[in-house]
Structures are given as structure tokens and as C-alpha cells.
Design a protein with these regions (language model features):
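Structural motif corresponding to alpha-helix initiation and N-cap regions
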Residues: 70, 117, 141-144
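Non-catalytic C-terminal accessory region of glycerolipid acyltransferases
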Residues: 2-33, 37, 141-236
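A structural micro-motif
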Residues: 68, 104-106, 127, 155, ...
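Helix-to-loop junction immediately C-terminal to a conserved catalytic motif
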Residues: 50-88
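Catalytic core of membrane glycerolipid acyltransferases/transacylases, capturing the structured
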Residues: 78-137
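Residue-level detector of flexible, active-site-proximal loop/helix-junction positions
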Residues: 74-77, 113-115, 136, 198-200, ...
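Helix-enriched interaction subdomains in cytosolic or periplasmic regions
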Residues: 34-56
Length: 236
């Protein structure tokens, strides 16, 4: 990996179009580090855009003959920002659960290679996304800090804290990283567990009750991460 602290020079669109994907990923990884102190802007505009984006997701789902059913929704109305912590069953669950939630969220998105030079990437960018190269420690730190700033500005976050697809039947929820709880503590966000199952072409989505971060302490992040994991497992 290149040193993120080296000087960064923005490149023209034409130059970026000519870059190989690996080089383009490195360019944007360094750009995210360069921009790490920038203010989060245009959340209201992105929220308005999501009213158009979600119907597009519905159309795409219908074209691929996918369905979803909400089998429970125990969300409590709140003025606090929200972190939707979802179980992860495959590559398309993020778009389906976002459609089902009907609540504007920034996507905490780790599929960097799929983001560039595709219309999907542009649409997600307009909606709002926190990109992360999970292989890179500095980029993980930058993504976490950016997500906290989004939440502090009143935005919501959609995240898969398992960090990988869970296709095992014996483990309802895999090990969770503590990042979701850490971000909730720093921003005052509510954690909302979401269980997702896929049978055939139908997603079954169960939305749990808010978990307040008000009384959480940083030194108890592992305890509350286990509480979140238990809540997610109970929804499957």
C-alpha cells in the first residue's frame, strides 16, 4: 500500500477514465485520506434524491424477479440519527433492505471495485455513501470517522457489521466488529438491528427495536456489541 500521507494531486476526469481499476482504487483511497477533514454537506439534498433512488431500486429488483417481505417492524420514532445494523446474506441485500426501510441512509460500502465507472456507483454516490477499502487500515479509520460526521450532521447509516456474507445455517450472526457501537457512542445515534433471510428469490426482513446509545460507555463497547449481535440474531 502507498503512504496515504504523501502529497495528493487531483486528476482530470479524462485521466481517471484511462486509469486501470487498481490504480483508480488507489487514487480514491488517497483522495479520501486527503479529504478526511472536509465537512459533510448536502444531506438534505441526498435525502430528497433518495425519493427517486428507491423506486429505481424497486424496478431493478422486479426486473431480477426478487421479492421481499417485512415480517416485523418495531422501530421507534426518534430524532436521533440511526445506524441500521443488518445481517448480511449476499451481494444484493443492501439494495433490497434499503428499499424496505424507506428511510434515507448513507451506505457503508466496501465493494470499492464495483463503485467506479458503473451507473450503480453514480446512483449510490448521489444517495450518499461512505466508501471503505476493508484491506487498508488507514482507510478503515477514515471511513469510520466520516460515518461519525454523517451521523453528527443528522444523517443515518446502513451497515453490515459482520463484515462478510453469512451463509452458514448454524450461526445466525457471525462475530461483529465493534465499529457500529463505537460510532453510535460518538454520535449519539440509535442502533437498529435488522435480520435478513433469503429463501429462493424472496428476502425476509425483520426490523428490530431501537437500541439507545445514551448510556453506553466506550470501555463497554464489546459488551454492547454482543448485545447488538444478540438482538440481530433474535430477528432471524
Amino acid at each position: 500500500m502507498k503512504d496515504h500521507t504523501e502529497s495528493f494531486k487531483k486528476k482530470s476526469l479524462l485521466s481517471r477514465l484511462k486509469m486501470p481499476i487498481a490504480e483508480l482504487e488507489d487514487y480514491y483511497r488517497r483522495k479520501r485520506h486527503f479529504d478526511r477533514n472536509k465537512e459533510i454537506r448536502h444531506i438534505a439534498l441526498r435525502r430528497a434524491y433518495s425519493k427517486l433512488f428507491i423506486p429505481l431500486l424497486s424496478m431493478d429488483r422486479a426486473l431480477h424477479k426478487k421479492k421481499y417481505r417485512i415480517i416485523g417492524d418495531r422501530r421507534i420514532q426518534t430524532k436521533n440519527p440511526k445506524i441500521y445494523a443488518c445481517t448480511h446474506v449476499g451481494s444484493t441485500d443492501i439494495s433490497v433492505v434499503y428499499e424496505a426501510l424507506k428511510d434515507h441512509c448513507y451506505w457503508f460500502w466496501g465493494d470499492i471495485g464495483e463503485y467506479y465507472r458503473k451507473i450503480d456507483g453514480l446512483l449510490v454516490f448521489l444517495n450518499g455513501a461512505v466508501l471503505i477499502d476493508t484491506r487498508d487500515k488507514q482507510d478503515r479509520r477514515n471511513a469510520r470517522n466520516t460515518a461519525v460526521k454523517v451521523l453528527q450532521k443528522g444523517g443515518n447509516l446502513l451497515i453490515f457489521p459482520e463484515g462478510a456474507w453469512n451463509i452458514t445455517e448454524s450461526t445466525p450472526v457471525m462475530h461483529l466488529y465493534t465499529g457500529a457501537v463505537e460510532m453510535a457512542i460518538e454520535s449519539g445515534a440509535d442502533l437498529i438491528p435488522v435480520g435478513i433471510e433469503l429463501y429462493g428469490n424472496t428476502f425476509y426482513i425483520n426490523i428490530g427495536r431501537n437500541i439507545s446509545s445514551r448510556n453506553m460507555q466506550p470501555d463497554s463497547k464489546q459488551k454492547y456489541t454482543e448485545k447488538l449481535r444478540g438482538a440481530m440474531a433474535a430477528l432471524k
